[in-house]
UniProtKB/Swiss-Prot annotation:
Chain residues that bind Zn(2+) 1: C60, C62, C75, C78
Amino acids binding Zn(2+) 2: C820, C894, C901, C904
Organism: Ligilactobacillus salivarius (strain UCC118)
Record-listed Mg(2+) binding positions: D449, D451, D453
Signal sequence extent: none
InterPro entries hit by this protein: DNA-dir_RpoC_beta_prime, DNA-dir_RpoC_beta_prime_bact, RNA_pol_asu, RNA_pol_N, RNA_pol_Rpb1_1, RNA_pol_Rpb1_3, RNA_pol_Rpb1_3_sf, RNA_pol_Rpb1_4
Protein name: DNA-directed RNA polymerase subunit beta'
Catalysis: reaction(s): RNA(n) + a ribonucleoside 5'-triphosphate = RNA(n+1) + diphosphate
GO annotation terms (biological process): DNA-templated transcription
Keywords of the record: DNA-directed RNA polymerase, Magnesium, Metal-binding, Nucleotidyltransferase, Transcription, Transferase, Zinc
Repeat recorded as keyword: no
Domain of life (superkingdom): Bacteria
Encoding gene (name): rpoC
Entry similarity comment: Belongs to the RNA polymerase beta' chain family.
């Protein structure tokens, strides 16, 4: 076998008939498969052991030679080589054809490759190949022309007229003759001449022909290889035949297709031997051609060959195509050993990086490790006995199992894996039952719940795999989400409500104003009922300072006013973390505010009475605490805090006794008045409509707004009258579950419902759930529910497909180097829409490198120098100083090939540190954009029925429109000149508006539809590329009028708009990477003195290289213009044919790659996965493979076997060092 890790690239080409014969181990002559009695393969048949190898390991067909000692012997009786049966998966045979046939891919593809080489139409080719017309292959001295088509009648006439003065033929033989006659070099030279003058259609055709001919010329492929004399027979184990119970056979469709070819081929041979009449032979040749076509690509031409039940047979092409094809089913996604799946259940007592594994599962998954350990401990004499012991479930194996799984991480995965947090590593802990246990905080990343979800478990086997699982994939490392760098693990539901409840404050609770020495005393008082969790008390600050809490000297001498609950809550935080007394950023990042401290001797009860109540810690603030702890203390401390927060939350939410009863749903007294008023207003509107004062559309819009206002009024009243101790209010306020709109539906009114067509129905549901709905109202509600369900189902599929396309276009973007030394940057400002802030400047500069120094606009002093990573503190300074625009390093302007450099990328959001070389940022970017896709809406919004306002596409369709570079719906007209809007005139006759823009050198007039809404008025200054009307700019127009960078910037801003409007935060850098991939190609306009062809697409880097060498040699360089490709097109235009073929349009990609003799440099991830090579990202990068480990402080690890022992030793050493200091 070849070692895939040894080679650097892979080439594809056309196979000549000689090549096919050289692959073959013998000719298949008979259509037989296996003997129905002996079930042994037939001689010379499709499963022949002489050709393909033995069916049993180390055994010939007749049984004369058995066992490995005869390895390599060829049996003299049956002619079978003694070897492994595995060779039946790799040895090929061939069929010698009695007449040549054309390969359907090259004849039928669009454009027809044969047609381009021969300069003939596909229709003409079809007539020749399928024996409908003759073609002149050699005109001799006659008046005929080469390649002229003749019908049967015309052919006879010409034969009579000219005799043997010309040659004409039909079928693939004629095509092969013509292809052999093509002089590639001469044709290329002629076409290049023609290109100098040609225009229009003629030029396009010439460019396409030249492209194909040069491809043949440069690749060393010969055009006549598109016609075959022999066809390969793929190994039998890849087209198996298996016996079903009941004695019938199931076989791969390929065997049927091969049998048809062999039958027809053998019949043709016999007919030729018999010298049968030409018409019969011709018919048989045509049938052979059709049989080979069906084998290669069934259904491409004519009706597909069908099997039983009229099912089209799967040909070789279908084996590669689609989700079930070879690429996506077997090469990119394999089933793996050492894996299992089970239902998940909650494991509230687990630590963050643990999972519970059922005994039975662990025993099966860790069986080899168990057997080794049993033999090692001499509990079993050999592996066989150990296996028996495990199968018997002996009592003494369970302790061994406990030790085997200790410190051996396993991977858990939940489908659908939308982002990289869908697979994480945990340390297994044995549990009873058959369900796996998952830590409740890991649910959010997996989007898992415990209503019957299943998860898959995988065991990393090698030491390297285990080390990577532990150091890179352990759940504790996945605290921040890669899409925005905010914590993805944060307490939810019960945990939130528990922590909310413990930090609540109430006035006048029992024991208010008591002063305590330390937290232990507070806890004792609480447990004995002297104080309540919500009681405001005094606590000696010095006792907390002794434990490490940072207080100023002034604060240390005073008494801290807090509540009993907050004192207990603060115990879970790291020792030297500020004491949290209020949910504010100042308290979190600075110190506890001075206002909570009083002098000893003050009347504390009186002081407390005059103090306002401080709000409890809600879900958002808990998340902020986690982010801050992670930033300061990194992984271990954060994981510990999370577990403590979880335990405290569950404990306190249980103790709080939070319940919901019908009495908790309050009824609003003012509701009948509001409803009555709304009814009156609706009646007024109806009257106006009847009198013809308003149109039906206006009436509809007004009715909708009346009912929406009524609902809003009821909601506002509810909020006013809300009791803060109401359990439903507590749930929604803390962020544990539910929001104000749920509350309105329970005790206010349900309001308007959506109809299945997406419009809102005029009839509102006036009741709420507390009162109960009437039958009609229930019926109205059900419409909206169905719409919601269908929308969700469609959205999931659309979003998944978007993710797949995004991953495909960006999978080869990896951090390749530390600095690309670019001299360009990106100017960023806050993204706004009207008065609404979409993305503030702070978010855009955080975690990025500055390109130029940032100066204070007032004083001129430098806030942040150039080439520095902007941390939180610097970003805050920049924003506070009032800076509006910052120039940063960006993926848009990075010079690195096939990727990005560390400086242009900035911070790795998932770790909070600078990104490292090898990080697969392209895949992460694609997942970050695709994963929230399901949260986006599917709708196009109407502009509130404003006449003439086109629908604005939003949500998922808008994201697809931008990334696919489609013409946007509701397109805006842009100006092509910079200048002043001179006139805006209406032209009622033409039903248009005319806007004239006067530039310095040029004046343009734009004729706009009458209904379009203008963005400009007379006298406005406009810059080229600015929109004149309301709507979406077409980026393809923008790139023509402006430059690449402003187009990239426009796409970035537009994508951000969609996501941020829906409340989804995504970092700019992900969108930058995707947009850059859409703009990495240029189209050659004028080739100059280079060998590039006009109109071809080239990578920017290749284009620059070729131009550089042309300039060095003193030739005229080529000119090109940048091209914006949609992500699907960009993914297919990649340099890797393996990656493109496994994405879409498999046959087209492979046909093209073969003709060009393409070389796949194996730069991306996908192509390496396909050939089974280590991916060139992360620890698989070359850079990391050539490292010699350096021994540091070797005495630490002497005689240490487990990680826990190692940690103890290291701690011991540190303690010794500290004590000696």
């Amino acid at each position: 076998m070849i070692d895939v890790n040894k080679f650097d690239s892979m080439q594809i080409g056309l196979a000549s008939s000689d090549k096919i014969r050289s692959w073959s181990y013998g000719e298949v002559k008979k259509p037989e498969t296996i003997n129905y009695r002996t079930l042994k393969p037939e001689k010379d048949g499709l499963f022949d052991e002489r050709i393909f190898g033995p069916t049993k390991d180390w055994e010939c067909a007749c049984g004369k030679y058995k066992r490995i000692r005869y390895k390599g012997v060829v049996c003299d009786r049956c002619g079978v080589e003694v070897t492994r049966s595995k060779v039946r998966r790799e040895r090929m045979g061939h069929i010698e054809l009695a007449a040549p046939v054309t390969h359907i891919w090259y004849f039928k593809g669009i454009p027809s490759r044969m047609g381009l080489v021969l300069d003939m139409s596909p229709r003409a080719l079809e007539e020749i190949i399928y024996f409908a017309s003759y073609v002149v292959t050699d005109a001799g001295d006659t008046a005929l022309e080469k390649k002229q088509l003749l019908t049967e009648g015309e052919y006879r006439e010409k034969r009579e007229e000219y005799g043997d003065g010309f040659k004409a033929a039909m079928g693939a033989e004629a095509i092969r003759t013509l292809l052999r006659d093509v002089d590639l070099e001469k044709e290329c030279a002629e076409l290049k001449e023609e290109l100098r003058e040609a225009t229009g259609q003629k030029r396009t055709r010439a460019v396409r022909r030249l492209d194909i001919l040069e491809a043949f010329l440069n690749s060393g492929n010969r055009p006549d290889w598109m016609v075959m004399d022999a066809i390969p027979v793929i190994p039998p184990d890849l087209r198996p035949m298996v016996q079903l119970e009941g004695g019938r056979f199931a076989t791969s469709d390929l065997n049927d297709l091969y049998r048809r070819v062999i039958n027809r081929n053998n019949r043709l041979k016999r007919l030729l031997d018999l010298n049968a009449p030409g018409i019969i032979v011709q018919n048989e040749k045509r049938m052979l051609q059709e049989a080979v076509d069906a084998l290669i690509d069934n259904g491409r031409r004519g009706r597909p060959v069908t099997g039983p039940g009229n099912r089209p047979l799967k040909s070789l092409s279908h084996m590669l195509k689609g989700k079930q094809g070879r690429f996506r089913q077997n090469l990119l996604g394999k089933r793996v050993d050492y894996s299992g799946r089970s239902v998940i259940d909650v494991g509230p007592k687990l630590k963050l990086n643990q999972m519970g594994i059922p005994h039975e599962m662990a025993l099966e998954l860790f069986k080899p490790f168990m057997m080794r350990e049993l033999v090692k401990r001499e509990m079993a004499s050999n592996i066989k006995n150990a296996k028996r012991k495990i199968e018997r479930r002996d009592e003494d194996i369970w302790d061994v199992l406990d030790d085997v799984i200790k410190e051996h991480p396993v991977l858990l995965n939940r489908a659908p894996t939308l982002h990289r947090l869908g697979i994480q590593a945990f340390e297994p802990v044995l549990v009873n039952g058959k369900a796996m246990r998952l830590h409740p905080l890991a649910c959010e990343a997996y989007n898992a719940d415990f209503d019957g979800d299943q998860m898959a478990i995988h065991v990393p086997l090698s030491d390297e795999a285990q080390a990577e699982a532990r150091l890179l994939m352990l759940a504790a490392h996945h605290i921040l989400a890669p899409k925005d760098g905010k914590p993805i693990i944060s307490p939810s539901q019960d945990m939130t409500i528990g922590n909310y409840y413990i930090t609540l404050e109430e006035a006048g609770r029992e024991g208010e104003g008591m002063v305590f020495k330390d937290v232990n005393e507070v806890r004792t008082a609480y447990q004995n009922g002297y104080v309540h969790l919500h009681t405001r008390i005094g606590l000696q600050a010095s006792s907390l300072a002794k434990l490490g809490t940072p207080f100023t000297d002034w604060q240390k001498e005073r008494i801290l006013i807090t509540t009993a609950g907050k004192a207990i809550f603060n115990e879970i935080l790291p020792a030297d973390f500020p004491f949290l007394n209020e949910p504010t950023q100042e308290n979190l990042t600075g110190m506890t505010p001075d206002k909570y401290f009083v002098e000893p001797g003050t009347d504390i009860k009186e002081f407390i009475k005059n103090q306002p109540l401080v709000g409890p810690f809600k879900s958002g603030f808990l998340s902020d605490i986690i982010a801050q702890v992670y930033k300061e203390y990194k992984v271990t401390a954060t994981a510990e805090l999370l577990d403590r927060m979880k335990d405290l939350g569950y404990y306190e939410s249980t103790k709080s006794g939070l319940t919901v009863g019908i009495a908790d749903v309050t009824v609003l007294k003012e509701k009948p008045e509001i409803i009555e008023q709304a009814h009156k207003n609706v009646a007024t509107v109806a009257k106006q409509f009847r009198r013809g004062l308003i149109t039906d559309e206006e009436r509809y819009n007004r009715v909708i707004s009346i009912w929406n206002k009524a609902k809003d009024d009821i909601q506002a009243k509810l909020v006013e009258n809300m009791d803060p101790s109401n359990p439903i209010q507590m749930m929604s306020d803390s962020g544990a579950r539910g929001n104000i709109s749920n509350f309105t539906q329970l005790s206010g009114m349900r309001g308007l419902m959506a109809a299945p067509n997406g419009k809102t129905m005029e009839l509102p549901v006036i009741s709420n759930f507390r009162e109960g709905l009437s039958v009609l109202e229930m019926f109205l509600s059900s419409h909206g529910a169905r719409k919601g369900m269908t929308d969700t189902a469609l959205k999931t599929a659309n979003s998944g497909y978007l993710t797949r396309r995004l991953v495909d276009v960006a999978q080869d973007v990896i951090i390749r180097e530390e600095d690309c030394h670019t001299d360009r940057g990106l100017d960023v400002t806050a993204i706004t829409e009207g008065n609404e802030m979409i993305e503030p400047l702070y978010d855009r500069i955080l975690g990025r490198y500055t390109m130029k120094e940032v100066k204070d606009p007032n004083t001129g002093e430098i806030i942040v120098p150039a080439n520095v990573l902007v941390e939180e503190s610097e970003a805050r300074k920049i924003v506070d100083a009032g800076v509006q625009k910052v120039t940063i390093r960006s993926a848009f302007t990075c010079n690195t090939r096939h990727g990005v450099c560390e400086r242009c990328y900035g911070r790795n959001l998932a770790t909070g540190d600078e990104v490292e070389v090898g990080e697969a940022v392209g895949t992460v970017a694609a997942q970050s954009i695709g994963e929230p896709g399901t949260q986006l809406t599917m709708r196009n919004f109407h502009q509130g029925g404003v006449a003439g306002g086109d629908d604005i596409t939003q949500g998922l369709p808008r994201v697809q429109e931008l990334f696919e570079a489609r013409n946007p719906k509701g397109r805006a007209v842009i100006t092509e000149v910079t200048g002043v809007v001179d006139t805006v005139e209406e032209n009622p006759a033409e039903r248009t508006k005319e806007v004239t823009v006067k530039g310095e050198t040029d004046t343009r007039t734009y004729s706009l539809p009458f209904t379009s809404v203008l963005k400009v008025k007379e006298g406005d200054q406009v810059h080229r590329g600015d929109a004149l009307t309301v709507g979406s700019i077409d980026p393809k127009e923008l790139i023509k009028v402006r430059d690449v960078l402003s187009t990239e910037n426009y796409i970035l801003r537009e994508v951000q708009k969609v996501y941020r409007m829906q409340g989804v935060d995504i970092s700019d850098k992900h969108i930058e990477i995707m947009t850059r991939q859409m703009l990495r190609k240029v189209r050659i306009m004028d080739p100059g003195d280079t060998d590039m062809l006009p109109g071809t697409l080239l990578d920017i880097s290749q284009f620059k290289d070729r131009n550089t060498s042309a300039i060095i040699e003193g030739r005229i360089p080529a000119t090109a213009r940048p091209v914006l490709l949609g992500i699907t097109k960009a993914a297919l235009e990649t340099n890797s044919f393996l990656s493109a073929a496994s994405f879409q349009e498999t046959t087209r990609v492979l046909t093209d790659a073969a003709i060009r003799g393409k070389n796949d440099p194996l730069v991306g991830l996908k192509e390496n996965v396909i050939i089974g090579k280590t991916i060139p990202a992360g620890t698989g990068m070359k850079k990391y493979h050539d490292i010699e480990p350096e021994v540091v402080n070797s005495n630490v690890t002497d005689g240490v076997y487990s990680i826990s022992e190692l940690e103890e030793k290291i701690n011991e050493q540190q303690n010794n060092v500290e004590s000696s200091n």
